[in-house]
Curated annotation (Swiss-Prot):
Cofactor: Mg(2+)
Domain of life: Eukaryota
Cofactor descriptive note: Binds 1 Mg(2+) ion per subunit.
Main location: plastid
Gene for this chain: rbcL
Enzyme Commission no: 4.1.1.39
Molecular function terms from GO: magnesium ion binding; monooxygenase activity; ribulose-bisphosphate carboxylase activity
InterPro entries xref list: RuBisCO, RuBisCo_large_chain_AS, RuBisCO_lsu_C, RuBisCO_lsu_C_sf, RuBisCO_lsu_fd_N, RuBisCO_lsu_N_sf, RuBisCO_lsuI
Record's protein name: Ribulose bisphosphate carboxylase large chain
GO cellular component: chloroplast
Active-site residue numbers: K166, H285
């Protein structure tokens, strides 16, 4: 009979459509689905498509007032995950009209909203998203991108060097500024506010901005190189955040910083727009990411958070080190490093990339390697990340036995030695330690650093690894 028929019907009758041909304008998602016992995978995949688009738990008569065929998400393919019991990859296609233009916030509210608390699923993880060019073009993206940043800084042909000022909390503004000066004077390109430095009683933001700007200009004058300090503009309200960014611009500094996950995508996109309009570079820290991305069966993979950041806007983002103290398997890390930097990335399941991604003209983001790295890691980092990256040594600079400036000198000498060796055709993976030892002969600072950190390793297996 025609007309409204009340009652509950299975999701898969409406939302599981294996015959569907995906459109170029669809947003495609790959979900790792772990259904509850007794729930067939088709029903679980269809439930994800329904609950993250037009569906609800029962038939409603207002369905008759719209075209569900036009607006519904569709689960169009399901694959069993090899080597895992009761895990499936469900592919879902979303029509573009479901999403507001230029809003990462709206995209995530749909795709990773209520559906993650759905009772029929034991666990759910968003592994990857394909953002169609039609949607990419509605975003400004990074304020400047890799090439414009190099032109602003006049630094080419090598990775950039940074350092997070430690201890991260407790220093006064003047002492903080002094540490910034010493690191920049020693040869680093950037120093960085820690992500939790905002405006606390021991150091208010305005005092920190002033002393850091003074340090920066002094180091610039003495070295003849352009220097930067990531001034953390993250604040409790968007208005306060923009106020801090305005003050940074008035001081004439080149770069500010934001914690994009704790601050939120709306705040981040607002700041990115301000930065492009006012010539500021934007460094992004990913505090809170491991809460979301570290478990293999539930949450959102970091490659999705990285894509979202490229859309929302940021010129640098922390992306793991492969060799330091923080999580990150090599192939997975290189997969999302490519997604940050390149214009076009082919599907490659061996690196965890589920979809071919075309960024059209969206600028690239520099990946930042940071966390437990020191001079002995320099050859590996140079080889893994290449020139378009920022290598950040916090303890690896400030922990030098002779002080901050010699720590910076050691890092700069090690980097220049690795870049020179690579350009001469030497194999950094095989000869790395030899290259560093040779450089020690003419740099006592580097020799001292090598002696201190020769035994330090962080040998733990990664939690989030590729499927077999």
């Amino acid at each position: 009979s025609v007309g409204f028929k009340a009652g509950v019907k299975e999701y898969k009758l409406t939302y599981y459509t294996p015959e569907y041909q995906t459109k170029d304008t669809d947003i495609l998602a790959a979900f790792r689905v772990t259904p509850q016992p007794g729930v067939p995978p088709e029903e679980a995949g269809a439930a994800v498509a329904a609950e993250s688009s037009t569906g609800t738990w029962t038939t409603v008569w207002t369905d008759g007032l719209t075209s569900l065929d036009r607006y519904k998400g569709r689960c169009y393919r399901i694959e069993r995950v090899v080597g895992e019991k009761d895990q499936y990859i469900a592919y879902v296609a979303y029509p573009l009209d479901l999403f507001e233009e230029g809003s990462v916030t709206n995209m995530f509210t749909s795709i990773v909203g209520n559906v993650f608390g759905f009772k029929a699923l034991r666990a759910l993880r968003l592994e990857d998203l394909r953002i169609p060019p039609a949607y990419v073009k509605t975003f400004q993206g990074p304020p400047h991108g890799i090439q414009v940043e190099r032109d602003k800084l006049n630094k080419y042909g090598r990775p950039l060097l940074g350092c997070t000022i430690k201890p991260k909390l407790g220093l006064s503004a003047k002492n903080y500024g002094r540490a910034v000066y010493e690191c920049l004077r020693g040869g680093l390109d950037f120093t960085k506010d820690d992500e939790n430095v905002n405006s606390q009683p021991f150091m208010r933001w305005r005092d920190r901005f002033l002393f850091c700007a003074e340090a920066l200009y002094k180091a610039q004058a003495e070295t003849g190189e352009i220097k930067g300090h990531y001034l953390n503009a993250t604040a409790g309200t968007c208005e306060e955040m923009i106020k801090r960014a305005v003050f940074a611009r008035e001081l004439g500094v080149p770069i500010v910083m934001h914690d994009y996950l704790t601050g939120g995508f709306t705040a981040n996109t607002s700041l990115a727009h301000y930065c492009r309009d006012n010539g500021l570079l934007l460094h992004i820290h990913r505090a809170m990411h491991a809460v979301i991305d570290r478990q293999k069966n539930h949450g959102i993979h970091f490659r999705v958070l990285a894509k979202a950041l490229r859309m929302s806007g940021g010129d640098h983002i922390h992306s793991g080190t492969v060799v330091g103290k923080l999580e990150g398997e090599r192939d997975i890390t290189l997969g999302f490093v490519d997604l940050l930097r390149d214009d076009f990335v082919e599907q490659d399941r061996s690196r965890g990339i589920y979809f071919t991604q075309d960024w059209v003209s969206l600028p690239g983001v520099l990946p930042v390697a940071s966390g437990g790295i020191h001079v002995w890691h320099m050859p590996a980092l140079t080889e893994i990340f290449g020139d378009d990256s920022v290598l950040q040594f916090g303890g690896g600079t400030l922990g030098h036995p002779w002080g901050n400036a010699p720590g910076a000198v050691a890092n700069r000498v090690a980097l220049e030695a690795c870049v020179k060796a690579r350009n001469e055709g030497r194999d950094l993976a095989q000869e790395g330690n030899q290259i560093i030892r040779e450089a020690c002969k003419w740099s006592p600072e580097l020799a001292a650093a090598c002696e201190v950190w020769k035994e330090i390793v962080f040998n733990f297996a990664a939690v989030d690894v590729l499927d077999k």
